[in-house]
Amino acid sequence: MKLARLTPSHIPYYIALMRIDKPIGTLLLLWPTYWALWLANAGMPSLTNFIVFTLGVVIMRSAGCVINDFADRKIDGSVKRTMQRPLVSGQVSSGEAISLFILLITVAFLLVLMLSVNTILLSFGALALAFCYPFMKRYTQLPQVVLGAAFGWAIPMAFMASINALPIQAWLLFIANICWTVAYDTMYAMVDRDDDLKIGVKSTAILFGKYDRHIIGLLNLAFIALMLSIGALNNIGLSYWLGLSVAIVLLVYQQVLIQQRARTDCFKAFLNNHYVGLAFFIGLLFSYPVAF
C-alpha cells in the first residue's frame, strides 16, 4: 500500500471519514478535557491552553476515526451500521486514509509544540493510544478500556500544561473518565453486538453478556463516586454539586433506556452521555469566576 495524494474533490468523503458531520465523539472528548483545564486552573485556564486543547481534541478525534476505519476496513462491510463508511464503499482509498491520518497528527503535534516540554512528552502517549485502540478489538475483550485511556489522555496533559504537575486529582479524574467511557461505549457496542459476534470482533458488550446493564451501572457508580471525591478534594462550589445531581439523573435515565437492549434505545442512551459531560462542565464553570 502506498500513500496517496489527497484530492480536493474527495473533501466530502474525508469529512465523513473524520466524522466531522457526527460531533458526538468530539464532545465526549472535549468535556473531560475542559473539566481538567478548569480543575487544574481553578476555573481560569489560559486562552492559549483553551484553544490548543480544543483544536487538539478535534483534530485527534478526527485522526482516531481515520485510523479506526482503516483498521476496520475489511470488517465494516459486515456490520449494518458501518457498511456505508467511505473506506468500505471505495470513496476513499487506504492510501488516502493513511495520508490524511499523517496530516492530522502532524497538525496536532505542531499545536502541542506550543505547550511545555513535559506536555509534549505526554502527547506521545496520546498518539500511541490513538493508533493502538482500533486494533484492540481483535485481541482483547476490553477494547473499551483502551478507548477510555485514549479519550482521557488529555486530562494529564491539561494538568501538566497548566501546573507542570500531575496531582492526585488528575489521576482520579483520569480513572473516573475511563469508568464513564467504558460504560457509555459498552452501550454503543450493544448496538453492534449481534454483528460483532458473527464476525468475531470483541467488546465489553459481548464480555458482559446478560450482566451488561448491571456492570454499566457499577461503572457509572464508580464514576460518580470519583467525581464526588474530586469535588470534595477541590472544595468546589454549589453549582458543581448541582451538575453532579443532574448527571446522576441522566445516568439513571440511560439505565431505563437500555432495559430492553433495543438497538435504537442503546444508541440513544450512548448519545445522552453528551449531556452528562455538559452537566459537569456547567457545574464547574459556575463554581469559579468567569475565565479569560
From Swiss-Prot:
Gene Ontology CC annotation, any one: plasma membrane
Database matches in Gene3D superfamilies: UbiA prenyltransferase
Membrane-topology descriptor: Multi-pass membrane protein
Record field: catalytic activity: all-trans-octaprenyl diphosphate + 4-hydroxybenzoate = 4-hydroxy-3-(all-trans-octaprenyl)benzoate + diphosphate
Source species, domain of life: Bacteria
GO process annotations (BP): ubiquinone biosynthetic process
NCBIfam families: ubiA_proteo (TIGR01474)
Protein name: 4-hydroxybenzoate octaprenyltransferase
